């Protein structure tokens, strides 16, 4: 049998024999660490680049930068000039359009006023035409009232009936603006009167309307029908003592 102590001794001897010296490890142990004095001197003597203040540009680089800046400035000036020209052109267009708008607005306003006047004139002409056709009816009523003499109660009743119609017609004409002229005793006006007779007389000044033969009418300030009148004329020489005025009546 083997001795246990002898076996343990042999195992320890074998392990110590297998231990090999590592040259690389020994070399690493001999390297200089950052904490060594030589390393500190090298770090202190190493130049440090100035990060905050980079190296100044060379003259060639400055010339290139100046040329680029000049080119950019020239381009900007050209763009500004083009924009100014476009602005002036647009301002001229706006001014022309504004002038056209003002002229169109004025033309439209004139057209509106003209058409309004034409419309009112047409309405007035139609109204005058219709009323003028009714005036002979009014004349007939007035002539009947003047010349008809009723003799019986029945005739008087009929007379009052159609005179009532006449009054309604006259009131209707008044409501739409028709008025009868009052020519007698006024100076003759060719715009209102139509002289159909002249009578030589000393009782009225020359040119005075002495009789209204047919009544004239107006619609507002427009003449619907001229009044037919007899006008006073100066007496002829030697006829002043003539007491019969009908002998001096002459047609116009």
Curated annotation (Swiss-Prot):
Residues 1-70 are annotated as: Disordered. This is Protein GrpE. The keyword Amino-acid biosynthesis does not apply. CDD domains: GrpE. It comes from Thermosynechococcus vestitus (strain NIES-2133 / IAM M-273 / BP-1). The keyword Cytoplasm applies. Participates actively in the response to hyperosmotic and heat shock by preventing the aggregation of stress-denatured proteins, in association with DnaK and GrpE. It is the nucleotide exchange factor for DnaK and may function as a thermosensor. Unfolded proteins bind initially to DnaJ; upon interaction with the DnaJ-bound protein, DnaK hydrolyzes its bound ATP, resulting in the formation of a stable complex. GrpE releases ADP from DnaK; ATP binding to DnaK triggers the release of the substrate protein, thus completing the reaction cycle. It is found in: Cytoplasm. One of its GO terms (molecular function) is protein-folding chaperone binding. GO terms for cellular component: cytoplasm. Residues 1-22 have a biased composition (Polar residues). SUPFAM superfamilies: Coiled-coil domain of nucleotide exchange factor GrpE (SSF58014), Head domain of nucleotide exchange factor GrpE (SSF51064). HAMAP family: GrpE. The gene is grpE. One of its GO terms (biological process) is protein folding.
């Amino acid at each position: 049998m083997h001795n246990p102590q002898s076996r343990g001794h042999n195992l320890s001897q074998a392990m110590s024999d297998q231990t090999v010296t590592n040259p690389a490890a020994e070399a690493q142990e001999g390297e200089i660490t950052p904490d060594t004095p030589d390393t500190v001197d090298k770090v202190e003597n190493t130049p440090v680049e100035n990060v905050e203040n980079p190296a100044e540009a060379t003259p060639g680089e400055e010339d290139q930068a100046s040329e680029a800046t000049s080119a950019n400035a020239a381009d900007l000036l050209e763009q500004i000039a083009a924009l100014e020209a476009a602005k002036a052109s647009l301002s001229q267009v706006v001014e022309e359009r504004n002038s056209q708008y003002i002229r169109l607005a004025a033309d439209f306003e004139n057209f509106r006023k003209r058409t309004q006047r034409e419309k009112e004139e047409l309405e007035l002409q139609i109204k005058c035409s219709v009323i003028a056709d009714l005036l002979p009816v009014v004349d007939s009523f007035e002539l009947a009232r003047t010349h008809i003499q009723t003799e019986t109660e029945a005739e008087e009743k009929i007379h009052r009936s159609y005179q009532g119609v006449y009054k309604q017609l006259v009131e209707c004409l008044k409501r739409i603006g028709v008025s009868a002229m009052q020519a007698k005793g006024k100076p003759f006006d060719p715009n209102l009167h139509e002289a159909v007779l002249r009578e030589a007389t000393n009782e009225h000044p020359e040119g005075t309307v002495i009789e209204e033969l047919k009544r004239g009418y107006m619609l507002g300030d427009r003449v619907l029908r001229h009044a037919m009148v007899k006008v006073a004329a100066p007496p002829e020489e030697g006829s002043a003592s003539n007491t019969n005025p009908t002998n001096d009546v002459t047609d116009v």
